[in-house]
Amino acid sequence: RNQEEIFRRAGRSIEIAMVADLDTTRAQAAAGPGVTVVADARAVIANPEIDIIIELIGGYGIAKQLVLEAIAAGKHVVTANKALLAVHGTEIFAAAHKHGVMVAFEAAVAGGIPIIKALREGLTANRIEWIAGIINGTTNFILSEMRDKGLDFDVVLKEAQRLGYAEADPTFDIEGVDAAHKATLMSAIAFGIPVQFDKAYVEGITKLGAQDIKYAEQLGYRIKLLGITKRTAKGIELRVHPSLVPAKRLIANVEGAMNAVMVQGDAVGTTLYYGKGAGSEPTASAVIADLVDIARLHGAEAAQRVPHLAFQPQSMSDMPVLPMSEVVTSYYLRLNVADEAGVLAKVTGILAGAGISIDAMLQREADEVGGEGATQTDLIILTHDCVEAKMNEAMAQMQAL
């Protein structure tokens, strides 16, 4: 599709010469005539006529081996493999730099949204302050359905699997791992730090109930799983967790399986990038964009290319990624407490003792929460900013009530 447009943009023809797939019959049917289909990917890497290898296998295992072999053979690489780059990016980018080849990965983050190019090139003049994004369509679909239909997580997950929005094993999505892979890559590009997935704080949506969605709405918020990375005086925050977003914000109204990324730069202010974060066509759009970039720069000196992580390798920052215990932010608490006098005073006393101030509070009648005759009720508290370590201390005391 759009071959003429692509040729006009690239300035040279780009030809698919070989495809490797264990199911060669399926691959041949998809590739069409004139394309050599093999079962062994190393045959593609070994072909001296091939300039660019596209890796769409996924995972850390054979994909890593093949990417490193392609780089060692002097081939440029295009990949959509966020997990591979988030975990092994430092090794892969160093190998690419050594061998003078490019590794392009627009499709690894937010599918059809060109957020990597925006961060690496479009916002070059800016000092990036923070990034916050809905970067996993599965969890955004689940949270949207929980809000719209008032259903619990487990029920909506099954529906998401039936519709094809969630994998048979959805762990990476619902536990926040997929979003953390993407946030790790954006953080490295935004702040010029090595990829450090092992230092990211990762929390998924499995502990959220329908009542949390309802209470957030009553307080004027919507719950979104956000990937957040932020520059602070002490270091870089890198975290994924459910977040309360004011309902009037544009990003709060990103529904279904769509993605959106907000970027704050000192010159441009807040910018928002929105679109399809997954799917065959959005992914293909990003892969082809990378192919065109490499075709334009094929043969160019390394100094004329955009560095993999936007900053020159010798200029990477040593700013630390902060542990979550040092992050300062506000909190949503849902406490299921005894419906009796004095409990509220104890809770507020614990928070005050930890130096945590309350921004807003809801208290439900016990029969609203557990039905007639219930003796437990929900106490919902929004706090002002405080350090996570203090909140953890306060939570430990409240759990003992």
Name every feature range the model reports, one short phrase each:
Residues 286, 291-401:
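A conserved regulatory-domain signal marking ACT and ACT-like small-molecule sensing domains
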Residues 10-13, 170-173, 194-202, 224-225, ...:
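Flexible, glycine/charged-enriched surface loops at secondary-structure junctions
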Residues 1-73:
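N-terminal glycine-/serine-/threonine-rich beta1-alpha1-beta2 phosphate-ribose binding loop
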Residues 76-78, 358:
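A short hydrophobic/small-residue beta-strand
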Residues 57-73, 80-121:
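Rossmann-fold NAD(P)-binding glycine/threonine-rich loop
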Residues 97-178, 185:
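Rossmann-like NAD(P)H-binding beta-loop-alpha module
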Residues 269-271, 275-281:
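Glycine-rich phosphate/pyrophosphate-binding beta-alpha loops
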Residues 155-253, 258-260, 279:
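Substrate-binding/catalytic subdomain of NAD(P)-dependent oxidoreductase enzymes
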